[in-house]
Amino acid sequence: MDIQETINQMGKKAAAAARAMRAASPSAKTSALLSLAQLIRQENKAITEANARDLAAAADRGLDAPRMDRLRLTDAVIEEMARACEFVAGLPDPIGATEKQWQRPNGLLVGKMRIPLGVISMIYESRPNVTVDSGILCLKAGNAVILRGGSEAFHSNMMLASLIHRALILAGLPQDAVQVVPSTDRGAIKALCELEEYIDVIIPRGGETLIRTVVADARMPVLKHYKGVCHAYVDEGADLEQACEIIFNAKVQRPGVCNALEGLLVHRSEAHTLLPAVAQKLGDAGVSFRACPRALPLLAPHGVPMAETDPGTEFHDLVMVVKVVDSQDEAQDYIAQHGSNHTEIICTRNHQNAMRFVREVDASMVAVNASSRFNDGGQLGLGAEIGISTSKLHSYGPMGVEELTTTKFVVLGNGQIRQ
């Protein structure tokens, strides 16, 4: 069977599973999630062995360090997946909830009820834990999902998919509610993008090339998890010791992820004090700086002149743009030009400046005196996320269970007809 036919058959199965999932009870979904948590812990060794095969093959192909980091499933990451299953199991079930209700003059009772999106396709790279996060969120929201992970994580993804299927069967739910494309053929991406007959929405999560390819080819709505070009602006009068800690965490903790810091904007009044401290603390951790002329001498010996192409670049590495600005206006203009609507930070003691930044800066998360690393479904209390949407429709920011649902109108009458 060629890849086109394989994807078509998966679409048919997913559509049938989505119909069954609309009738699934909250208790059945909870049972599946708790069973999956138990299976993940029980099968730690098998998961690690499958992941080791992927890591060895990736190393042979010369996969870069940030992608190797995202590919690796440590004991801590495996336990985190199990805990995510348990957390999502404990979340309120959104399906069937009536959000608004009002009565018309003719006696009609009108309401909006939350329902599943239907069939979702998720296309992603490197991170095998996304297989579990996506599967459990779609399951909790009553959807069916077709997952196409990166070829570098193939064995890990198939192992995790087998555990999800076992959990679904144990709970009496259709195992086709979560399917993983059983092939590394890149033609699967195009085939999924063309399957509008069965797929209601497609979510790409990965590099810029993948996102642009899916947006160009998809015949159904796309929820984009676009690149993360995140900035911190350090305001005049900010707590500089606190700001330095925030900048360090946001850049150094995991430089290859989408909520890592890529640019630092410093008010001119604070540059001579803050930037030497940043150079020492982050420089000692291996960070190099692409700096504007005013920042460069303050970052010695870790800085180089900023190139024209550096602003707006997602480095995925221990590299950061640094610019001295004359005002908050200049900082916000820079962010508007070079940001990616992902995450933006202001470090400030000035409440008025903070609220202005929150109100005017266009990003899926704006943080005041906190790290960009908090733009994450688990960190924000969603349990897990299927991605961080940088689109405003249908969701903006981390997409948890509720973001994978929509609403329909429900009208209750007693014989009314339109006059």
UniProtKB/Swiss-Prot annotation:
Superkingdom of this protein's organism: Bacteria
Catalytic activity: L-glutamate 5-semialdehyde + phosphate + NADP(+) = L-glutamyl 5-phosphate + NADPH + H(+)
Pathway(s) served: Amino-acid biosynthesis; L-proline biosynthesis; L-glutamate 5-semialdehyde from L-glutamate: step 2/2
Main location: cytoplasm
Keyword match Magnesium: no
EC number(s) per entry: 1.2.1.41
One of the GO biological process terms: L-proline biosynthetic process
Protein function: Catalyzes the NADPH-dependent reduction of L-glutamate 5-phosphate into L-glutamate 5-semialdehyde and phosphate. The product spontaneously undergoes cyclization to form 1-pyrroline-5-carboxylate.
Protein's name according to its UniProt entry: Gamma-glutamyl phosphate reductase
UniProt organism field: Oleidesulfovibrio alaskensis (strain ATCC BAA-1058 / DSM 17464 / G20) (Desulfovibrio alaskensis)
The encoding gene: proA
